[in-house]
């Protein structure tokens, strides 16, 4: 469940550099997947993200 700086996992989501202690990012856009991020929250177990980005 912990995120590291080099592609650790956060729950179901594979992460790059994380936003916050355990927040995934959107890969193509590089912005946070979360309530405050432009991509919106991550949805579903395959890392799809609301807003057209991917985690």
UniProtKB/Swiss-Prot annotation:
It comes from the Eukaryota. InterPro entries: MSSP. Testis. One of its GO terms (biological process) is spermatogenesis. Keywords: Developmental protein, Differentiation, Repeat, Spermatogenesis. Coiled coil: none annotated. Disulfide bonds: none annotated. The keyword Ubl conjugation does not apply. Transmembrane segments: none annotated. The keyword Zinc-finger does not apply. Belongs to the MST(3)CGP family. This protein is mostly composed of repetitive C-G-P motifs. This is Male-specific sperm protein Mst84Dc. The gene is Mst84Dc.
């Amino acid at each position: 469940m912990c995120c590291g700086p080099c592609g650790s996992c956060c729950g179901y989501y594979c992460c790059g550099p994380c936003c916050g202690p355990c927040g995934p990012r959107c890969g193509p856009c590089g912005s946070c997947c979360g309530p405050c991020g432009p991509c919106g929250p991550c949805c579903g177990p395959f890392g799809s993200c609301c807003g057209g980005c991917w985690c």
